[in-house]
Amino acid sequence: MKNPTPILLAIGVLTFTNCDTLKQTAGQMATDAINQQMGGGNTTSKPILSKDEAIKGLKEALLVGVNKGTDRLGAVGAFAKNPSYKIPLPPDVQAVEQKIRDNRILNKLIGGELDKVVDAMNTGAENSMKKAVPIFKKAVTEMSFQDAMGILTGGEGAATDYLRKTTESDLQGAFKPEVKKAMDGVSLTKIWNPVVTQINKNKRILGLDNDIQTDLNQYVTEKATTALFQEVEKEENNIRKDPVTRTTEILKKAFNYADQQRK
């Protein structure tokens, strides 16, 4: 019988060579898959969308929404004349408003003041919008690539939802002092305090168990922030739906890529 060693060695060499080849092939396939997920192809072709471009595109879309939203909401009558955004009396006051207006004495004392409170809240909210842009810009600075890609290829409002979930509490904290300044500018506190005093003084007549203790500044801040998020979402959805609204190269590149991924 011939010596089998050379044959076995040859088979061994081929086996190890094939294993190395398989490993290299698998590695290349993984690399190609990552490149494809990033929007690129092989190493010689330019990626369609880089990590930085994905994040910059989303940030720009959000900031476009903030800028346009604050412009719209900062206009005279933007809150007061828009049923979607008009800030009504706080719920605890709404609950007794009709009783106040039905009571001749109370209506004479504070009926007109209730209307002034509503006017002042809405005017103050409009005036606070000019201070919102830098606060929102700061909030948009941190966003991971994984978040960016998921949001970019997500559905309508995905970017705004992300911003709302991750920053709303901090945004309200930063925005609240600006809302207070705007409220002070329209003398809301001077109007509000006598109203609350009269309501609490007559709470038994009005059927109230407890005093009115609404933090009016917090109430208006929440309403103003909610309205701004809604405006940002409208603009984001416009950018997603209508290529004409993609007015910069980074917006075109990011959202054209998103369009391709959904096909």
Which residues fall in each region the model found?
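Bacterial N-terminal signal peptides that target proteins for export
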Residues: M1-I7
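Bacterial N-terminal signal peptides
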Residues: L8-T15
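N-terminal Sec signal peptide cleavage junction
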Residues: C19-D20
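A cross-kingdom marker for long, charged
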Residues: Q24-A33, Q37, N217, E222-K263
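N-terminal Sec/ER secretory leader and immediately downstream segment
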Residues: Q28-A120
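Extracytoplasmic
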Residues: G57, N82-S84, Q146, K223, ...
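Mid-length scaffold segments of soluble, non-membrane domains
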Residues: N107-A182
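An amphipathic alpha-helical core segment
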Residues: E178-K223
